[in-house]
Amino acid sequence: MINEATLAESIRRLRQGERATLAQAMTLVESRHPRHQALSTQLLDAIMPYCGNTLRLGVTGTPGAGKSTFLEAFGMLLIREGLKVAVIAVDPSSPVTGGSILGDKTRMNDLARAEAAFIRPVPSSGHLGGASQRARELMLLCEAAGYDVVIVETVGVGQSETEVARMVDCFISLQIAGGGDDLQGIKKGLMEVADLIVINKDDGDNHTNVAIARHMYESALHILRRKYDEWQPRVLTCSALEKRGIDEIWHAIIDFKTALTASGRLQQVRQQQSVEWLRKQTEEEVLNHLFANEDFDRYYRQTLLAVKNNTLSPRTGLRQLSEFIQTQYFD
C-alpha cells in the first residue's frame, strides 16, 4: 500500500507504467479513509502535469448489447496498433439486489491478459455520482501511467450515460437492432450526447435488421441539433463477435479527435469538464459539511417530516432551511 514514506517512489513507478503501482494508487484513491484521502490528494496533485495526452473514450450500452465482446475486440485492435489501453468499468450496482449489472473482466479474457491493457471495475453501490468521481480520478492515474487510450464503460441505465459523457472526449453508444422499434430503445438525451452510435451484432441473419436500424438512427440524428458544429455524429455497424467493422470505428474516432482538435474545441471541452467537475464536487462537499452539523441535520429532518405530512410546502421548507443556513454560517 502506498504511504507517506513511499509516495515519491510510487509516483516514479507509476510514471514508468508499473501495473502493480497503478493498482495500488487506484486502491488509495478509492479509499474513504481520511488519511488515505489526504494522501491521494497529494498523489493526484503530483501527477497532473503528466495528464492530458490520453484519448478519453466513453462506451455505453444496455445489457445484451455485447459491450464486453466489443471492448475486447476494440481493445485488442488498439494494442495491435501499438497503443496501451485502460478500461474503467463504472458499475451502477442493482438498487434491488446490490449485485453487479456489468459483466466482470473475465468476459474480456484476451484483453485482461494483455500486457498493454489494464481493466478496473468501479462499483457504485447505488451511488453513481461517487462512482463517476472515482472513475475520473482513476482515468487520470491511467494517463499518468502512460496509457494512450482510456475507455470508461457503463451500462445504459439511469443517469450513467450522461455522467460518463461529461468526463470523456468521444462518447460511443453501443446498440443492437430489434424488430423496427429501435428508436424506442434509445433515449433522446442519449442520442444528443453520443458522438458515435455503433450497432453491434451485424452478423448471422441480422443484416437486414441492422441496415434498417442504421437508417432510422441516421435519420433521427439529422433532425437533432448537433452537439458540436465540427462533427456530425455517425452511425456505424460492426460484428464484435466476428471482429468486423471494428477498424472503421477506430478511424471514425480518429476523425472526431482530428476535427475537434483542429478547431480547439477539444481543449475547451476538457476545460469545461474540469470546471463542472469542480463545481459538482464543491456542492457535494458543502452538503457533507452541512449534514455533519448536528443542528442542521436535526432541523432538516424536522422540515422533511413536515413536508411529508403536508403541514409545510416544499417551497416554505426550502426558504426555512436557507434562512437557517444563513443564520448559522453567514450572519
Curated annotation (Swiss-Prot):
GO terms for cellular component: cytoplasm. The keyword Mitochondrion does not apply. Changing S68R: In strain: RC101. Keywords: ATP-binding, GTP-binding, Hydrolase, Nucleotide-binding. ATP binds at G61, T62, P63, G64, A65, G66, K67, S68. Monomer. Interacts with the methylmalonyl-CoA mutase ScpA. Part of an operon that encodes enzymes converting succinate to propionate. NCBIfam families: lao (TIGR00750), PRK09435.1 (NF006958). Binds and hydrolyzes GTP. Likely functions as a G-protein chaperone that assists AdoCbl cofactor delivery to the methylmalonyl-CoA mutase (MCM) ScpA and reactivation of the enzyme during catalysis. This is GTPase ArgK.
